[in-house]
Amino acid sequence: RVLFRSEDERPWEVFLMFDFDSYIRLLREDPKTIVLPEGTDPRVIEAASRLLAGNFLQPILIGEEDAVWEAAQEAGYNIRGAKILTPSTYEKMDEMVEQFCEIRAKKGMTQEKAREILKDPNYFGTMLIKMGEYDSLLGGVMHSVIDTIKPALEIIGTKEGNNLVSSCIGLVRPRATGDSEVIVLGDCALNIKPTEDELVEIAHETANCARDFGIDPKIAFLSYSTHGSGKGPDVDRMCNAANKFAEKYPHMESIGEVQFDAAVSPAVAATKCPGSEIAGHTNTFIFPDLSAGNIGYKIARYLGNFEAFGPILLGLNAPINTLSRECSASEVYHMSILTAAMLGHRDHSKDS
């Protein structure tokens, strides 16, 4: 069954768990800007039009100005008030080139090569954030996750205390009772086979993001084994990661290693994890590797009728995010709000 036949039929209730009213109020009180590198895509144009109509978040569209206006006209959306930037005519390009050469000096960056690289809207947009011209960036509508993350890593880097950048996906769907079900999955987009310590960091960042989504994280380190029922190096890796996490963050509820059925089904948990208070009730899932995470989230999205938010990038030193290329205009709009407001104002110092 298809939950929504068209974007217009997606009820606002799907997004209530994210408390967008609070995010919008925050943005009205503390105005922000968001760079959208794929300025000619109809989904980006529609999202920008909605942001402009709401007058709470200023979109910055990257692209040839004539092409952006033509795309807006063809799509039938009003983007008056949007700022459009074209790399080839950007007035501060000389300054941008100088800064980019400084950042990449150890890699032998030359001005000629820098000018060529900065024609790429993702590099250009990321440098706008680095220079402090604008506040946040959302890409991935027409490009891969790597196209967004590579310039972010090269230019922005990780925040203090983080050793890697990871990602999570927020999945939400309405319940018949009128509220929403929300689960968070990590890492689904970046780290191919994280080590034990990397899994601990991924779990911590994913749990903090779950709090941003309005849920109390109950974390499951997923495996094909539940508490030693299976054997193998991947089981050991997840078991050790779960133990390290519990030792480092004893105030955060977690379980592992555990199979998915025992993590979400109270009936199965009663058999496989007797005595566990959170088994069967977890909502934040840490996958052992990228294959499992990416496949798992797409199964949930397409067969479970979940609305997806992300991949949300975790650990960067600036609010930069990406979408998947199959995203809708509605997802661009809502992820723009999340990126500018929620991810730009996170405070989890008690967990760090």
Residue spans of the language-model regions?
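Short, small-residue-biased leader/transition segments that mark boundaries at the very start
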Residues: 1-3
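Anion-binding alpha/beta catalytic cores of soluble intermediary-metabolism enzymes, centered on
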Residues: 17-352
